[in-house]
Curated annotation (Swiss-Prot):
This is 2-phosphosulfolactate phosphatase. Inhibited by vanadate. It comes from Methanocaldococcus jannaschii (strain ATCC 43067 / DSM 2661 / JAL-1 / JCM 10045 / NBRC 100440) (Methanococcus jannaschii). It is an enzyme of class 3 (hydrolase). Its cofactor is Mg(2+). It comes from the Archaea. Hydrolyzes both enantiomers of 2-phosphosulfolactate. Able to hydrolyze both enantiomers of 2-hydroxycarboxylic acids with pseudosymmetric centers of inversion. Specifically hydrolyzes (S)-phospholactate and (S)-phosphoglycerate. Keywords: Coenzyme M biosynthesis, Hydrolase, Magnesium. Optimum pH is 5.5. GO terms for biological process: coenzyme M biosynthetic process. InterPro entries: ComB-like, ComB-like_sf, ComB_archaeal. The keyword Transferase does not apply. Belongs to the ComB family.
Amino acid sequence: MITLCNRFTEYKCGNVAIVVDVLRASTTITTLLSFIDEVYITTSTSKKENAIYIGERKGRKIEGFDFGNSPTEILANKDIIKERYENGEKVILTTTNGTRVLKSLDAEHIFIGAIVNAKYVAKAVEDFEDVSLVPCHRENNFAIDDFIGCGVIAKYLNGEFDEFIKAALELTKHDWMSLILNSSSAENLKNLGYEKDVTFAILENSIDAVGIYKKDKSKVVRFK
């Protein structure tokens, strides 16, 4: 059964979960895993060690951090990040919603899903019978970008769908890109100067990297 899990802090969604934060944590993590092997996850905004710090609060880069939660900024600085990572520095990420959901979710296998890796994350879970798609939403308010992101991933999944997934799939049959581009999450990012992140985040299947969250080590590692 393929289900949509919204109440991630209150009960176990299922044995296998795909966390979806299109704008932008899932997209940023997937982008990072296209050229490094692991990303540490934290909910803290403090800097405690020599590392590459990436993060935002309410869309804005955290003061003193190396980079914001911006996939296009990450790509623009790919060589710098990769060199520092290969020289032994950890990459540490914190975001308003996505990292909080990862920390609180109770599932045995937690994958990182986005529009940019939709078919690849679906492939990663193809051997599991029951899969929960977990939209992060925006500070506990409904975010249509994450709902549609779940639908885009569900297109590549086989199995019986619950009613929420069916609704998300129905949206993907129409002009779903415009819905995301005009969403409140997208408008907020545009107002902060991150319009390129929004257009990047809707590039379906543009990155073949998939991350899996290792909760005991507080990090996402490249699955494939």
